[in-house]
């Protein structure tokens, strides 16, 4: 039996097995084996070229993928926000290649990818879906682009991403596995875990762990535990935009918001836009900035003063050392200390080391050996 047939057989058995406490361990093993087989198939297809794909060279400080079914307005949106020139049409399958555009915002260069419109079954390869989804996996943020008239597409889009191991708006499970030489599998938990020991051990054995110490924090489900021991899961934040709001009647607004709630999206979190009329785009840009966690660092350059025109862009939580690494050159090996003025400093020109955590709009001066 080939990998694809094996996967189909496992999926069928899982679907036909009722889930309860007595079948939990069995289903856990089946799901773990399914994840393992899918990972092997993914590696096999990648190794054989996978049918061309959509190789996109990433540029800028962050990459954002616009995800939506055909003709929801992704091309119009990227053209309105960037200097891209994506063909726009009022019919499906207009975008045949990935069209990157660069958004300049608050001194940052944010690459937006207008990927070909997804169709149902993309994760299974329909419409070049696997190649498209592989591009999305490399992004820092995914934006779901929905039509105001087809809110139900959100569930289908989220499912396609989940099926290729993209986990949006989720933290990786806290699962640590350390191999050992003998004595089987020991399970250590924080006291909250509802899965029994047989289920946990069965999942780990399917993953190839025979002798290991596993530490699990929290109370992950079977699926989350499997995520925690797999290497091919990708975690990223997401935003939901609702396009074409210029075309709706005022009386339809309540229906649209109810539809969002029905599909698990708070209307307060959704961003309502009209790409055609360029409405709501400032709100979208600000929300993107926050979701990406970008911050601006103004460099104090010797003899030239503080450069506020072209800030160094790093991520929230990053340190002086991260800034030094991004600056490149010989600065890393010549580094002595740094001085910081701004939100992260206790006072102006505070002397700090490499591990000092920077904040948005800090002024940084690196003192280096000659």
Curated annotation (Swiss-Prot):
UniProt entry keywords in alphabetical sequence: GTP-binding, Nucleotide-binding
Lineage: Archaea, Methanobacteriati, Methanobacteriota, Stenosarchaea group, Halobacteria
Domain TGS: 293-368
Chain positions recorded as GTP binding sites: 68-75, 114-118, 243-246
Recorded GO CC terms: cytoplasm
A GO molecular-function annotation: GTP binding
A biological-process GO annotation: cytoplasmic translation
Record organism: Halobacterium salinarum (strain ATCC 700922 / JCM 11081 / NRC-1)
Family: Belongs to the TRAFAC class OBG-HflX-like GTPase superfamily. OBG GTPase family.
Listed name of the protein: Uncharacterized GTP-binding protein VNG_1111G
Domain OBG-type G: from-to ranges: 62-293
InterPro entries: Beta-grasp_dom_sf, DRG, G_OBG, GTP-bd, GTP-binding_2, GTP1-OBG_CS, P-loop_NTPase, Small_GTP-bd
Domain of life: Archaea
Keyword hit for GTP-binding: yes
Pfam families referenced in this protein's UniProt entry, alphabetically: MMR_HSR1, MMR_HSR1_Xtn, TGS
